[in-house]
Regions:
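Conserved PLP-binding catalytic core of the aspartate aminotransferase-like
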Residues: 299-332
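Conserved active-site segment immediately N-terminal to the catalytic lysine
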Residues: 193-205
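A glycine-/small-polar-enriched, mobile loop at the entrance of the PLP active site in fold-type I
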Residues: 16-72, 76
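Conserved beta-loop-alpha segment that forms the PLP phosphate-binding cup at the N-terminus of a helix
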Residues: 65-94, 98, 102-106
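Active-site phosphate-binding strand-loop segment of PLP-dependent enzymes
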Residues: 127-186
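PLP-dependent enzyme catalytic core of the Aspartate aminotransferase-like
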Residues: 6-11, 343, 347-397
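Active-site C-terminal subdomain of aminotransferase-like
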Residues: 26-27, 205-291, 295, 397
Length: 397
């Protein structure tokens, strides 16, 4: 569908939609091509070749030496799986809640378990590692595991996961450290051994730039042993089944064959760019966008040191301005961004910039914001945002 907007009496057409939500994200042509290839049997040598490549291709993205498990399901499924395969029914464990997806971990925990300890962090703030370790030291129970987000998608905070992992190891090396990386894996530097992470999960539709439908589990060797020991009932989400099948280059249940192929197409794209360059691109775009939003007098929710490289949240002047920005981007410029979630609904807007996103995509939304705010606030912002954005891209690239 063609969107049109009149500027100075000239009709401006926007033929291609620009999706800038924090998931799903735009899918590259190379991946769409892989999705369109002829179907093969999921219990055939053809699929075994595809699966083996996919399990191995994800290793550098997740910072692990172990083949990565792939489930045909949503990201929430592996949040649940990470808990059911680590925590026994009577164990005590901690969930860090700093936003809507930390709250999802909490909801999963309270569905299955009775000894759940919640550590609340102000939405928009990172977890303070020293304060959290002090909190653990005052608990009167032996803690089996700690669950946290890496990037809290609802606020755009990137938690200091490496620092937290090291601190947990020093505090009590027996504690399992489980990390939800759904909205940042593929755009950040992570290493399971270095960061003392036992389970790291993610989904296909964010920085890994596939359609929704696959979920991923990376694991330490001691976590793999723990999967075998845990008695919590589970069936489809029993990770032992996935590991056993992985050893045979297969899956325990019918997989999405096309998306497995797409994983390999994704890996080819990342190898061509160089994964370090992929990470750098995300951080440069983040810095440029933040500078541009400030130039447009839009307040940022998250401080610079803990800002995610995959999603940026900002605070319009009021709810009316928020509604106007979001709707006008869509109706007049064919650009889709996201609103707030949970307690931040109606208070912030979020721009996703992960996966198949270039500086030119962000220039489009920045220039659109200039036009929208100039009209709405009756203040001239034309050129201010794109100038700041371009300066950052030039200096950091």
């Amino acid at each position: 569908m063609v969107k049109s907007y009149t500027v100075g009496g000239i009709l401006m057409n926007y033929y291609e939609p620009l999706l800038l939500t924090p998931g799903p994200t735009p899918v590259p042509n190379e991946i769409n091509h892989a999705l369109g290839l002829p179907m093969v049997g999921h219990r055939s040598p053809d699929f075994e070749i595809i699966a083996k490549k996919a399990f191995n291709n994800l290793k550098p993205i997740f910072g692990t030496d172990n083949e990565v498990m792939i489930l045909t399901s949503s990201g929430t499924s592996v949040l649940e799986a990470s808990m059911l395969n680590i925590v026994n029914p009577d164990d005590h464990f901690v969930v860090i809640v700093s936003g809507a997806f930390g709250n999802r971990f909490k909801q999963i925990a309270e569905t299955y378990y009775k000894n759940v300890h919640i550590y609340n962090v102000e939405w928009g703030q990172p977890v303070n590692v020293n304060d959290f370790i002090t909190y653990l030291s005052h608990l009167e129970h032996t803690i089996t595991a700690v669950f946290t987000q890496f990037c809290e998608t609802s606020t755009a905070v990137l938690h200091p996961v490496a620092e937290l992992g090291k601190a947990l190891k020093l505090f009590n090396e027996a504690i399992y450290f489980i990390v939800d990386g759904v909205s940042c894996i593929g755009a950040v530097d992570v290493d399971l051994k270095r960061d003392y992470i036992d389970v790291l999960v993610s989904g296909s539709q964010k920085a890994i730039m596939l359609p929704p439908g696959l979920a991923f589990v990376a694991y330490s060797n001691r976590a793999l042993q723990r999967f075998q020991e845990v008695t919590t009932p589970r069936f489809y989400l029993n990770l032992n089944k996935y590991f056993d099948s992985l050893q045979q280059d297969s899956t325990p249940f019918t997989p999405n064959v096309g998306l497995f192929r797409a994983v390999n197409a994704y890996a080819d794209l990342i190898n061509a760019e160089g994964f370090k360059n992929t990470i750098k691109r995300h951080y440069i775009i983040r810095d440029g966008l933040r500078a541009a939003l400030r130039a447009l007098d839009l307040e940022l929710l998250v401080e610079d040191d803990f800002a995610s490289p995959t999603v940026t949240s900002f605070i319009p002047t009021d709810k009316d301005e928020l509604t106007h920005i979001k709707s006008t981007l869509k109706t007049k410029f064919n650009i889709t961004i996201a609103g707030g979630q949970g307690k931040l609904k109606g208070k912030i807007l979020r721009i996703g910039h992960m996966g198949k996103v270039s500086p030119f995509d962000i220039l489009a939304v920045v220039s659109a914001l200039e036009v929208i705010l100039t009209d709405y606030r009756q203040t001239n912002y034309i050129g201010q945002g794109i100038t700041k954005f371009s300066e950052v891209i030039h200096s950091e690239a």
